[in-house]
Amino acid sequence: MERNPILAAMGGYPLAEIQMRARDLREAGAPLIDFSIGDPREPTPAFIPEALKDAVPSISQYPTTAGLPELRTAIADYLRRRFGVSIDPATQIIPTAGSKEGIFHTPFAFIEPGAGQGVVYGSPAYPVYERGALFAGAEIDPIPLSGDFVLRASDISDRSWERARLVWSCSPHNPTGSVTSNEDLVDLLERSRSEGALFASDECYVDVYEEDPPGSVLQVAGPDLAGTLAFYSCSKRSGMTGYRSGAIIGDAEAISALIDLRASAGLAPPEFVQAAAVAAWSDDQHAADRRVIFTAKRSVLRKAFEQVGLPVVASTAALYLWVAVGDDVAVTIKLLEQGVVVSPGRAFGPGGEGYIRLALVPTLEECEVAVDVLVECLDE
């Protein structure tokens, strides 16, 4: 059967291929410690599934695309606590079925297919920026990131700015864990506005950090959030990867366009999932508790790489360690053969070659076991 040519050209999702190889090893009986996919092993805080169960109705009804008012209010309250910003829950917030689908579908609301409009993002990058852009009919424009893996307005050429319709930033950054300063966010946002481009800030990991809390574009965009979208998720903050719950916050006109798009596709999280998200966004302590666990894992693994003289680059926030190893494919295969699954940096696009990414998803105990394998394999 013939496939959409875009789908045929891009092949499988990069990390899915790694998972297939790992699955084959598991089926052969090999024990694996898996750092490849950002799906933490810590239990979801008990009050969250309780809220979900309490909200399951006896009669099923379609959810509204705009989402429950209670959820939009809970998200606005969280943003006020976290960033000191005032967001209108009625016009500036829309829930999504996780941030991934929101990120993928956003270009469909703003791109004119085949018109040569550019979607700009730093590379290496979360693969969904590229994939959503291509399926929406945009021209992709990956910008090579410098040594600190932070995208800055000055990194983007005038030619790229001229054709840009959508500009992505990601902070804390996937795959590297770098953090973009508010000053750099201001520069990106102001240039995007001056060029007539929509600025989209992926902030899904903003509550996963070691010391200094990362900022948000919402703090610098002004009360109307003109030309701005920010993307949030319950997945890592609250251990809700399987619930599929996120949100887009931003410019009321852009949110309205997204509601129209999403209504056409029936993209709305179930209301019992939204009820669980209300509980999650209303509580900050569980996010702080999880942060302690991720910091402990990061420390254990960083020491292992330091022991064998391999630099951990950036990696002060988000869920990832980004390690310079030389031949990322060879190292990935070597570790896989020894029972440790990591992601080769090139899976995240140009600029990822020579690095591996480790997601802080195994338990702390598993991380400690993995250290011995890492040291033995990488010290050779």
How would you describe each model-predicted region?
Residues 9-10, 63-66, 176, 289-292:
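Short, surface-exposed alpha-helical recognition segments that flank or form part
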